[in-house]
Amino acid sequence: IFRCGIENGTSMDADSAKAEYESAEENTDITIPFTFTEPEITTEKMNANLFKDTLGSYSSSAAGGTSGRIHNVGLTASICNGQIVLPGETFSFNGVVGDTTAEKGYQEAAGYQDGKVVQVLGGGECQVSSTLFSAILYTDLDVLERANHSMPVHYVPSGMDATVFWDSPDFKFENNHKYPVKIVMNMDSSDTLTVKILGTKENDYTIEPRVEQIDEMSNVTYRDYKDASGNVVKSESVCASKYKPLNSGS
């Protein structure tokens, strides 16, 4: 008789088990030793550390925009607010927000199209994707997909914007951490949008973005990893941007 009961976190030596089974006499019990493997992150540890740290944050102002634009920024932020990205998962901005239709409550506002400023449904959603990207730049989360606008924008620095449109281009990042991360977005009474990336800090580095100009209309965005003394111990290139001059509008 061969008896075994395998639970989560246990393993056995298959070769030893086979040898014991083959050498055992008929109708006798055999004992197979199991090894208990302690999980790297227990449920208790996970719950105790869940979303306790602000990994990155960024704020941008929508003040001075049309009522439609401010409405669209707030609506998009409310859709993204509270999104949780599990370890190994990919966050897709378009996958969460979807198409910016009137049925969803979106209004017309200024946006870029074919190198011009025109009225489009959902104008302003790119401020949310750009502010999210800017917050992500203060973390070591992997940026998988990001495209710059055709022309510079006013709400984030050059090289820190992320244009989106249904269904492409998209903005995507991967949670390469051991713990989940949560996206928190808030639009306050002064029309300032704040994006925070909450999670569990897994290293002692401080991460800051740096944009290096190549020429007047192109640049490369880096992340600088700094130790406790403020020394840069590592730099990595995140993306390159190339813009055209702004024709008109804002």
Residue ranges and their predicted role:
Residues 1-250:
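Well-ordered beta-sheet/strand-loop patches within structured domains
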